[in-house]
From Swiss-Prot:
Pfam families: DMRL_synthase (PF00885). Belongs to the DMRL synthase family. The lineage of its organism: Bacteria, Bacillati, Bacillota, Bacilli, Bacillales. Signal peptide: none annotated. It catalyses: (2S)-2-hydroxy-3-oxobutyl phosphate + 5-amino-6-(D-ribitylamino)uracil = 6,7-dimethyl-8-(1-D-ribityl)lumazine + phosphate + 2 H2O + H(+). Its EC number is 2.5.1.78. GO terms for cellular component: cytosol; riboflavin synthase complex. Forms an icosahedral capsid composed of 60 subunits, arranged as a dodecamer of pentamers. 5-amino-6-(D-ribitylamino)uracil binds at residues 22, 56-58, 80-82, 113. It is an enzyme of class 2 (transferase). This is 6,7-dimethyl-8-ribityllumazine synthase. HAMAP family: Lumazine_synth (MF_00178).
């Protein structure tokens, strides 16, 4: 039996972090957590590119562009969608999650989903560095592990867009 496991060594890795400006009071904390975690694990600050987009809905498009640039070993997506009084929340959450998943499945590099989808501002604050940890930092750690696993397979996928 062969067991594959990733590690968290970020040395020499180039990372893109696509971040939504909407709800920036939360996303900026997620971004800080992600950057800090990457740097702690050996990613050089100059090898981290932050790409700001207007809102969560725009994340998949720019993520796809970042992947196709072939400049990165992996991409993190960060955003915050907080339920309001209308159904807008449901549409945005569904489309951003499907879009990021589709980009990831059609990519040769890991693309991780760090978009918070919460019922309240309080839940978002908790996940941006208070009671529930920092989901940006957790996503960054997951990305490093996935980059390591990806490198273990050296598979060129056919038909990647």
């Amino acid at each position: 039996m062969t067991i594959y496991e990733g590690n968290y060594n970020g040395q020499g890795k180039k990372i893109a972090i696509v971040t939504s400006r909407f709800n920036e009071f939360i996303t900026s904390k997620l971004l800080s957590g992600a950057e800090d975690m990457l740097i702690r694990h050996g990613v050089a600050r100059e090898n981290i590119d932050v790409i700001w987009v207007p809102g969560a809905f725009e994340i998949p498009y720019i993520t796809k562009r970042a992947v196709h640039s072939q400049k990165y070993d992996g991409v993190i997506t960060l955003g915050t969608v907080i339920r309001g009084a209308t159904t807008h929340y449901d549409y945005v959450c569904n489309e951003v999650s499907k879009g990021v998943a589709q980009v990831g499945m059609n990519s040769n590099i890991p693309v991780l989903f760090g978009v918070l989808t919460t019922e309240s501002i309080e839940q978002a604050v908790e996940r941006a560095g208070t009671k529930a940890g920092n989901k940006g930092a957790e996503t960054a750690l997951g990305l490093l592990e996935m980059i390591s696993l990806n490198e273990q397979f050296h598979v060129e996928s056919v038909g990647m867009n």
